[in-house]
Amino acid sequence: MLVGVTTPEKFYFDEVHYVPAARQMLEPVMPNPVLNPMHPPLAKQLIALSIRSFGDGPLGWRYPGVLFGALSIVAVYLCGLALFAKPGPAVAASLIAFFNQMLFVQSRIAMLDIFALAFGLFGIAAFMHGFRQARPHLAFALAGLAFGLAAACKWSGLFALAVCIVIVAAIRLMQGWRTQFADGRDGDWYRPGLWPDFRYYHFAACFVLLPAVVYLATFVPLHGLSASGLVEAQRRIFSDNTTTAIAGHTYMSAWPSWPLLVRPVWYLFDKIGDDRIAAVVLLGNPVVLWAALPALAICLRDWIVTRRADAFLVLAFYFGPYLAWALLPRTLGFLYYYLPAATFASLALVYVLRRGNSPRWLLWAFVAVACAGFAAMLPISAAFVGTSMETFVRLMLFQSWI
C-alpha cells in the first residue's frame, strides 16, 4: 500500500483540513484558533508525529494512514479468527477486505477514518474473542481500550462500542428474565449461563470508564488537565457535528444508498498529459460489496432460524456502525462513512462461502475474483498508476458515478 503513496505531491480532498491541523500541533505553543476542532485529536496527533519523523511532505502526511490500513487488515484477520476459529477463513476475510477497494484508497490519504477503523476493528476482534469465553473480562477490557482510541480519532468510532454495550445489556436482561431456548445449543448467540462472573461493575469499567479515560487522555497534550478545557472541546465537537450548517457537496450521498455504491467520492482528478489523468475515486469493489448484500441476508436467515452466534456477530457489527448514521441529525454524508461496515462485510462473505457443505475452493475462487475486480479498479484507486480518459470513462459504469 506504500508504493506510490507520495503521488500526488499536493494536498487532495480533505487533507486540506487535517494536515494543517497536524502541523499546528507541532508548534511549541498551540496557537489560536485551533484548526479542525470538530474532531478529536488522536489521528491528527499521529499524522503530526509522522510529519516530525518523515518530514512535512507527502510521505509524512500519508505514511500513518498506510500503517493503520495494514493494521486494519490484521484486525480483520483477528475478527475472522474469533468467528471461524481457523486461520484459512480469517486470511480469506482479510484479503477480501483489502480487495474491496475502500480500505486501500482510504489508507493512502491523510484523513481520520482509517485510524478510527483500525482501532475499532481491534476492539471488535477483542470483543468477539471474549464473547465465547466464560471469563471475558480481559478481552472486554481490551475492547474498551481500543474503542476509546477509535473515538479519540473520530466520534464515529463510538458506534461499535455502542453495539457492544447493547449486546451485553440485552444478554444480561434476558438472563435476568431467565430466558431460555427450548432446544438450547452451545452455538447459540444467547445462553443463560454466559459470562457467569461478569458483573455490572465489570461492564461499567470495560465499556464506560476505560474508554472514557483513554479518550479524554488524548486531549491532555492540547488542554492539559483543565476540566473546563476538556468540556469545551467536547461541546465544540458536538456542536460542529450536529448544529453547524454545512453546504451541500458534489459527492454527498444518503446512507440508504451506500450499500448499492450509488454515489462514489472523487478524491482526485488531475490531467497529467494529453490523454493521461491521475484519478482517485473512493467507490468500493462492486464484486465484493454487491455480493455482500445477499450474504448478509443469509446471515440474517441463519440467525433467526438457527440462532448461530457467528451470524449474529456478523450482523451486529455490520448493521450497527452502518445504521447509526440513520439516527444522526447530520445531513451531509459520504460513501466513506460506510467504510467500517463495508470492511466487515468481508466476514459475511466468508461465513456464507464456507457454510454447510460448500467446497473449499469456492471461497478461494471468490477471493481470486475479488482480486481481479480490485486490479481492474487500480487506475482509479491510486494516483501514481495513471490512466487514459477512455479507460476512466469505461470504469464509470453508471451516470451517478460521474
Predicted regions and their residues:
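Membrane-interface transmembrane helices that cradle and orient dolichyl/undecaprenyl
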Residues: F84, G123-F140, A150, A169-T179, ...
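Hydrophobic, aromatic-rich transmembrane alpha-helices
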Residues: K271-R307
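Transmembrane-helix motifs of polytopic, lipid-linked glycan transferases
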Residues: Y63-F84, F122, A126, P294-C299
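Short acidic/glycine- and proline-prone juxtamembrane loop motifs at membrane-interface regions
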Residues: Y12, G65, M102-F115, W155-S156
